[in-house]
Amino acid sequence: MRFLFLACVAGGFATGVASKPVCKTPEPDWRQDVTPADVTRLHEVRESFVKALAQARAGDHGKDVAREGLLLDPDAAIDGAALPVGDYHCRTIKLGSQSVSGPSFVSYPALDCRVTANGKVSRFVRVNGLQRPTGTLYPASVRQQVFLGTLVLSDETRALNYGRDTDRNMIGAVERIGPRRWRMVLPYPRFDSTLDVIDLVPAN
């Protein structure tokens, strides 16, 4: 804080004109909060997407994949990734499997999610369900937000802090895929699937 103050003062006198210094608050950066393991997971998001689709098709779910259209197209992202504040219908699809005998395609009914403002970042919460991703949405690019969060289970009432439990840590890419449609892509989750995709549609 002291360094920041001095930098602002120096900036104010750099031109020789007495003026009120203007200090900019640093932009939030997910890289400052993420674990090394999750950096790797995010870098492999496309790899996990392609692998999960191949597993689903090999498991005789080609028609299920095709039916989802842009939602399960790895290259469907368009500009405008930032999720607006509000309530959403959110439907999870689990693609691929971490075990030989596990299902390679599971589509769950839509549940309720909410996005709220929290300074220069946003807060994402799944309101109901047995597995509830909860965490922070960071700006990354015009085509991506980064989600860092944890998985809240069953009747738990509070989320663990990100980074406390590697089995609960979650990282994902939020992308817009239509005029009023987004998705959250979660590569290599700790349980069950190779990739989770959450379909996000505004509730109103």
Protein language model regions, located:
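Amphipathic/hydrophobic helical signal segments and adjacent flexible N-terminal regions
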Residues: 18-83
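An anionic, turn-rich surface loop/hairpin at beta-sheet edges
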Residues: 98-111, 147-173
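Short beta-strand segments that buttress and anchor functional surface loops
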Residues: 122-128, 148-150, 184-189
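Mid-length scaffold segments of soluble, non-membrane domains
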Residues: 80-145
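Positively charged n-region of N-terminal signal peptides that target proteins for export
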Residues: 1-4
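Edge beta-strand at a domain terminus
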Residues: 66-70, 162-204
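Cleavable N-terminal signal peptides
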Residues: 6-7, 17
